[in-house]
Amino acid sequence: MDNIKIIVASDSIGETAELVARAGVSQFNPKQCKHEFLRYPYIESFENVDEVIQVAKDTNAIIVYTLIKPEIKKYMISKVNEHALKSVDIMGPLMELLSNSIEETPYYEPGMVHRLDDAYFKKIDAIEFAVKYDDGKDPKGLPKADIVLLGISRTSKTPLSQYLAHKSYKVMNIPIVPEVTPPDGLFNVDPSKCIALKISEEKLNRIRKERLKQLGLGDKARYATEARIQEELDYFEKLVDKIGCPVIDVSDKAIEETANDIIHFIEQNKSK
């Protein structure tokens, strides 16, 4: 028995149509259903359709297609009917059923599945990046980061990094401590990618005292004293002035509000 020719035609890469076709073929004895796939991706014109139709006529092939753009799909159907060819519309019936059920018009944009997949994997990469480079663990992350957060302890660097990662930004955060020299690479990073997180002395004092209580320690530890906090804030301001990056006051802001401010800064600089 001759091989059955199956033409996979799509206005995207054709992966969906081929997967469905292969699933169908797998239900038959391979000895009785010898087959060959011919993929025609990115069908964007009537001429592309004509090419598929000609090959189908010459080889007596079955056309399996996912064509989203209405004018291209309509032309394919007319040509298939004109030449009495065998064909299967993979997406059309489902899209029509969904459209009627929810009373909404489809986007009619090819490749949406892959765009969604790309967005998902980009977000996962960003989340993994935020974990790997949290708290300045590895300075090698600096040139790879979309955003570098700077701040002294208890300025919400880690939760902000995670929140922004879920927005698909690769974020590294670096703790600013007077006794610890910042990584050399920090001064080579574009200042427009750096965001310094500022907090008032009073607010930080309250947060740190509460943190010490949670740890079962007295609130008189140096970590929460006004002198220590002022020392850290002074060092922070000198470092930020040297870098020349934007500063956001997080004293009375929710994580979401601060994150939106950061995104605004970053996107504004991208458009310059």
Swiss-Prot record:
Signal peptide: none
Main EC class the enzyme belongs to: transferase
Catalytic activity: N(tele)-phospho-L-histidyl/L-threonyl-[pyruvate, phosphate dikinase] + ADP = N(tele)-phospho-L-histidyl/O-phospho-L-threonyl-[pyruvate, phosphate dikinase] + AMP + H(+); N(tele)-phospho-L-histidyl/O-phospho-L-threonyl-[pyruvate, phosphate dikinase] + phosphate + H(+) = N(tele)-phospho-L-histidyl/L-threonyl-[pyruvate, phosphate dikinase] + diphosphate
Protein name (database record): Putative pyruvate, phosphate dikinase regulatory protein 1
Superkingdom classification of source: Bacteria
HAMAP family xrefs: PDRP
Function summary: Bifunctional serine/threonine kinase and phosphorylase involved in the regulation of the pyruvate, phosphate dikinase (PPDK) by catalyzing its phosphorylation/dephosphorylation.
Molecular-function GO terms, alphabetical: ADP binding; ATP binding; phosphotransferase activity, phosphate group as acceptor; protein serine/threonine kinase activity
Kinase recorded as keyword: yes
Annotated positions binding ADP: 151-158
EC number, UniProt record: 2.7.11.32, 2.7.4.27
